Amino acid sequence: MALDASALMAPVERDVRLFEELERLLGEVDLLVPAAVRAELDRLAAGASAEAAAARVGSDLTERGRTVTTSERNGDDALVALATAGEAEYVVTADRPLRDRLLDAGVPVVETRGRTRLEITEP
């Protein structure tokens, strides 16, 4: 399962208990974080805004997964590449355009439903 920056920021921005919800849905899973997503979080973490604070938490949460390097420099592109190559069965995101790209590519998406719950959307 691969994690997007928006998913890693959700515990702060949406009060989602990310890892508890993932375990509820799918049990224990191997979590992947593309290096490009980690770099995106590091860029967003600069400053004193609420988004920066959420990105700092998200960056810390990447430690719970395995960082993987891809040839893609953009986080969304890296997630699509991992999933379509079969390296990630699901992608967790709150990003609507990424969600649509993944579903169009036949990849199941774990996304927020309501304020604090995650659900699986199948293609």
Indicate where each model-derived feature is located:
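Acidic, PIN/NYN-like endoribonuclease modules and their adjacent C-terminal/linker elements
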Residues: 99-123
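Residues at the C-termini of beta-strands that transition into short coil/loop
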Residues: 35, 71, 113
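Acidic, metal-associated active-site segment
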Residues: 73-90, 96-104
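Residue-level detector of structured alpha->beta connecting loops
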Residues: 27-30, 87, 106
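Domain-level signal for Mg2+-assisted phosphodiester chemistry and nucleotide/NA-binding surfaces
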Residues: 1-64
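Short acidic-hydrophobic, aromatic-tinged amphipathic segments that line or gate anion-handling sites
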Residues: 66-73
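Short, surface-exposed amphipathic charged segments that create phosphate/polyanion-binding patches used
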Residues: 46-47, 83, 122-123
